Regions:
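Substrate-binding pocket helix/loop in short-chain dehydrogenase/reductase
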Residues: 93-106
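Conserved NAD(P)H cofactor-binding loop of Rossmann-fold oxidoreductase domains
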Residues: 85-90
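Conserved glycine-rich Rossmann-like NAD(P)H-binding loop of the short-chain dehydrogenase/reductase
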Residues: 25-43
């Protein structure tokens, strides 16, 4: 099974990638949409032509990363495209942001 995986798919660039690729990409069987907000993923999936696997996961959470890893291992899809749009940012003086938040932001932006 050929799939497209999109993280951060519930809004912004992730959502837009899902919508645009759904219309123009015919060489894949399924889209895997990943984001924290499952209800938004369901809304997006309802408007898509392709089969969609909804994964309401928080990729900053190790248990949720395990769910994703296990899903990939179990189903063994061919990932034709990986679009990493999950992420967050903080505004303001970085010295006022706790180091845990800073490293969490970098970690998510690199892994997801």
């Amino acid at each position: 099974m050929n799939i497209v995986v999109i993280t951060g798919a519930s809004s912004g660039m992730g959502r837009e990638f899902a919508m645009q690729l759904d219309r123009g990409l015919h060489s894949v069987d399924e889209f895997w949409l990943i984001a924290r907000r499952g209800s938004r993923l369901k809304e997006i999936a309802s408007g898509m032509q392709h089969t969609v696997k909804i994964l309401p996961l928080d990729l900053t959470n190790e248990a949720d990363m395990t769910v994703l890893t296990e899903s990939l291992a179990e189903e063994k899809p061919v990932v034709r495209m990986l679009i990493n749009c999950a992420g967050y940012g903080m505004m303001g003086d970085f010295t006022a942001v706790p180091i845990k938040e800073q490293t969490g932001e970098v970690d998510l932006n690199c892994r997801a």
